[in-house]
């Protein structure tokens, strides 16, 4: 997936479509799976309800 797919431009504002990893910080996105969000760098996982 290209970086351009992580953002949505609304006029002069930018909206992030993915969450950043809370452990790794800004610039490392969480992968959006069917039942969880996962960081590929550190392995952090959040399960969806």
From Swiss-Prot:
<dbReference type="InterPro" id="IPR022845">
    <property type="entry name" value="Ribosomal_eS31_arc"/>
</dbReference>
<feature type="binding site">
    <location>
        <position position="24"/>
    </location>
    <ligand>
        <name>Zn(2+)</name>
    </ligand>
</feature>
<dbReference type="GO" id="GO:0005840">
    <property type="term" value="C:ribosome"/>
</dbReference>
<feature type="binding site">
    <location>
        <position position="39"/>
    </location>
    <ligand>
        <name>Zn(2+)</name>
    </ligand>
</feature>
<keyword id="KW-0479">Metal-binding</keyword>
<dbReference type="GO" id="GO:0003735">
    <property type="term" value="F:structural constituent of ribosome"/>
</dbReference>
<protein>
    <recommendedName>
        <fullName>Small ribosomal subunit protein eS31</fullName>
    </recommendedName>
</protein>
<feature type="zinc finger region" description="C4-type">
    <location>
        <begin position="21"/>
        <end position="42"/>
    </location>
</feature>
<dbReference type="GO" id="GO:0008270">
    <property type="term" value="F:zinc ion binding"/>
</dbReference>
<keyword id="KW-0862">Zinc</keyword>
<dbReference type="Pfam" id="PF01599">
    <property type="entry name" value="Ribosomal_S27"/>
</dbReference>
<dbReference type="InterPro" id="IPR011332">
    <property type="entry name" value="Ribosomal_zn-bd"/>
</dbReference>
<comment type="similarity">
    <text>Belongs to the eukaryotic ribosomal protein eS31 family.</text>
</comment>
<keyword id="KW-0687">Ribonucleoprotein</keyword>
<dbReference type="InterPro" id="IPR002906">
    <property type="entry name" value="Ribosomal_eS31"/>
</dbReference>
<dbReference type="GO" id="GO:1990904">
    <property type="term" value="C:ribonucleoprotein complex"/>
</dbReference>
<keyword id="KW-0863">Zinc-finger</keyword>
<comment type="subunit">
    <text>Part of the 30S ribosomal subunit.</text>
</comment>
<keyword id="KW-0689">Ribosomal protein</keyword>
<feature type="binding site">
    <location>
        <position position="42"/>
    </location>
    <ligand>
        <name>Zn(2+)</name>
    </ligand>
</feature>
<dbReference type="GO" id="GO:0006412">
    <property type="term" value="P:translation"/>
</dbReference>
<feature type="binding site">
    <location>
        <position position="21"/>
    </location>
    <ligand>
        <name>Zn(2+)</name>
    </ligand>
</feature>
